């Protein structure tokens, strides 16, 4: 199993390009199953989860074509099986996203219950109840969701999400695109990745309105066709590199990103003392060599502060001036990285869903273990601001969400290298 070795103490300084958003790319790839002619998806990040989704398509008889720029063309007309098997789904929770498209287009689907990061319960009941509201018959048995559409296909319906669910919103939006009549999704997720999926569906000929608000209206159409679509930039990757620069007192310019979908994070970085400039597709952060100030964070669904940036801000607070409280309201059990950081000399106290972080001048390098995707990014940041060497184990978590993380950090002057397991 690969490991990362980081020798801390360098301020980050330089420019890098931001990759396409994994959390946008995966639902958009799933949406290609709705089209009866080829769809080309561009600006895909080179990540394990993307490879897994492409491998899943291959198992189903769909053979995507990948060009020299790593754009992927999907022609779902060759599909042979409507089963998403456990051995692939167990490694990637987003596999559940093929359920809605397969059910809407082909009338049935069988998808294994998903795996993914171990950060609390993420029930799929919202997906199931939403599809049932559109007429689907669904059974869960043997670890699989087995779904059938009624004769004549899914019909429009009204569905209220008891809790905001990004993948639930995306799955029902895709299913509704080919359903008969109008579907109204209330208390829908407002994330930029949901908007990106809606834009892609509309480019394929769908009629989706209201994405980005909490009420999405989808008028079903008879067919969806081919399109060429660019995935939006990854706001969490963007935020991670900004926080890494802030924690080290450095300066970075991030290109091919979108500052308008990161406002809550940028506001907190300015509170921490960062000087931030933005353009249409770039963000520049400069700490001017200063130590960050501790900030208070409360996670909540978009447009509030994202749960996927919580761990990185704990790392910054760990070496900041003062004390900051971080309240996690989206997922339970999402402070597992804290115990690893405390082994590096951080002063973090967890009480229920709150972490109280008292900054220290510098952490100390130590062997640590990644527990999930964003926790692993926070340990990388901790390693960058620590004295001596930090060895991070189980970095397959990082590879699920960050494209070429060690190469990008090396471009910014970090001393980081990958050691094969």
Swiss-Prot record:
Q: Which InterPro entries match?
A: Enolpyruvate_Tfrase_dom (IPR001986), Enolpyruvate_Tfrase_sf (IPR036968), MurA_subfamily (IPR050068), RNA3'P_cycl/enolpyr_Trfase_a/b (IPR013792), UDP_GlcNAc_COvinyl_MurA (IPR005750)
GO BP term (any one) = UDP-N-acetylgalactosamine biosynthetic process
The record describes the protein's role as:
Cell wall formation. Adds enolpyruvyl to UDP-N-acetylglucosamine.
The broad enzyme category this protein falls into is transferase
> Which Pfam families does UniProt cross-reference here?
EPSP_synthase (PF00275)
**Record-annotated residues binding phosphoenolpyruvate?**
22-23
Protein family membership: Belongs to the EPSP synthase family. MurA subfamily.
Say where the protein is mainly found. cytoplasm
Q: What is this protein called?
A: UDP-N-acetylglucosamine 1-carboxyvinyltransferase
Localization per record? Cytoplasm
Positions of disulphide bridges: none
What Enzyme Commission number(s) appear in the record?
A: 2.5.1.7
Catalyzed reaction equations? phosphoenolpyruvate + UDP-N-acetyl-alpha-D-glucosamine = UDP-N-acetyl-3-O-(1-carboxyvinyl)-alpha-D-glucosamine + phosphate
Q: Name one GO molecular function term.
A: UDP-N-acetylglucosamine 1-carboxyvinyltransferase activity
What CDD domains does its record include?
A: UdpNAET
Q: Tell me the NCBIfam families matching this sequence.
A: murA, PRK09369.1
Q: Which residues carry this modification: 2-(S-cysteinyl)pyruvic acid O-phosphothioketal?
A: 117
Where, if anywhere, are coiled coils annotated? Answer: none
Pathway, per UniProt?
A: Cell wall biogenesis; peptidoglycan biosynthesis
Please name the source species. Answer: Pseudomonas paraeruginosa (strain DSM 24068 / PA7) (Pseudomonas aeruginosa (strain PA7))
Q: Which UniProt keywords apply?
A: Cell cycle, Cell division, Cell shape, Cell wall biogenesis/degradation, Cytoplasm, Peptidoglycan synthesis, Pyruvate, Transferase
Q: Name one GO cellular component term.
A: cytoplasm
